[in-house]
Amino acid sequence: MIKPRTPPGIMELLPREQIAFQRMLDVIRRNYERFGFLPVETPVFELSDVLLTKSGGETERQVYFVQSTGALANAAAAADEGAESGGLPELALRFDLTVPLARYVAEHEHELSFPFRRYQMQRVYRGERAQRGRFREFYQCDIDVIGKDALSIRYDAEVLAVIHAVFAELGIGDFKVQLNNRKLLRGFFESLGVAEGELQLAVLREVDKIDKRGAEYVRDTLAGEGFGIAAAQVDKILAFVAVRSNGHADALAQLQALETSVGASVTLGEGIAELREVLELVKALGVPETAYCLNFSIARGLDYYTGTVYETTLTDHPQIGSICSGGRYENLASHYTKSKLPGVGISIGLTRLFWQLREAGLIAGIAESSVHAMVALMDESRLDDALDIARRLRIGGINTEVQMEPKKVGKQFQYAARAGIRFVVLAGDDELARGVVAVKDLVREQQFDVARDELASTLQVELEQAKAMLVSGIAAN
């Protein structure tokens, strides 16, 4: 007999956990749609030559390729005959949602209205080394605004407002959207004489590690043989990336101080101007100043970001790391079209976020069920009544299960409790003779009678009053 087991790197949930996960998806989707983003889905696999526009490197080593049994047989036969391999398999599973978006926009460019506002919530696949908290299959929940030729910086502020709306409704505790601009970093590096493009990108990648690896690690790396940056310059870089703002006015003051002390090179001046505009618009969008700050160390490791960058963290749980990130890029689809398609977007890695929240004990919705009520059956002769009660409840918007076979009441209560069902409806001879049903509330441990015709509306009121937030922060110590 084969031992049942899931592959490593997969998060498989029990039903009540899946309900909590699904509700988080629903919150994210609802907020994306409130801001006018349109749904898009792309195939789970793409043509390999389209997906892997840059061959080699870490990305290709993590890609899952797809090959039919016929193609495998043909490849094996060719190998037996000494023929050379025909190259990569034709198809590959997507490893993020950004490359499929680039292909999608380029392919449908003349059918889309720009700026194109899309959201996409699908699984992606990476051949990660199996370890705790790392997944080979995981959900990403992305939004992007794509422009044609140009895209206003105002959309960068709107994206930050979307981040705030999502996490405010999720209710997973206080959070902070940390904001920076790559032009700010590049302009500052230029003022230190670090102007060569590849060197700048390499320094940016190291700076982005400062929160994870610490300032001393970054200092040793930048001053080491690989970079050879003078110690005095490294000190200036570390002092610069240590800047954090506290409140809206302080953020603007930090930008003014930077402009005064360093001097506004073209690149630095653009970065400062863009951040100023984003900050002013974020305020106009109603995002509270406690929800965002400047953090000059945020660079985002991906090289295609060119302007605004975001990282979101939970204030009381920094060990969880970034829960949402993204930024501005200048040309999304340069490998697929000559059109210039700048954009800005963010991604929530929901699988990892959910896993981290569960590990930290922050998921409050796990004890819930999508079934609100169960109609008990104590006597075979009352099956028709039980089915009618369930039908009326469903019409009234109450998700309802019926016990199809009579059992002892205690066993039916036990079943409902284990399934996370809150209300058990009892319709025995005595209740029906009085025109009522009895309702057992397993959460409050109370029982009450309700007129049969008022049952659905009564339970609706009870559910609305007791509607708990999906997730809650741990109470302050």
Swiss-Prot record:
It comes from the Bacteria. GO terms for molecular function: ATP binding; histidine-tRNA ligase activity. It catalyses: tRNA(His) + L-histidine + ATP = L-histidyl-tRNA(His) + AMP + diphosphate + H(+). PANTHER family: HISTIDINE--TRNA LIGASE, HISTIDYL-TRNA SYNTHETASE. This is Histidine--tRNA ligase. Homodimer. One of its GO terms (cellular component) is cytoplasm. Belongs to the class-II aminoacyl-tRNA synthetase family. The keyword Ligase applies. Keywords: Aminoacyl-tRNA synthetase, ATP-binding, Cytoplasm, Ligase, Nucleotide-binding, Protein biosynthesis. The keyword Manganese does not apply. CDD domains: HisRS-like_core, HisRS_anticodon. It is found in: Cytoplasm.
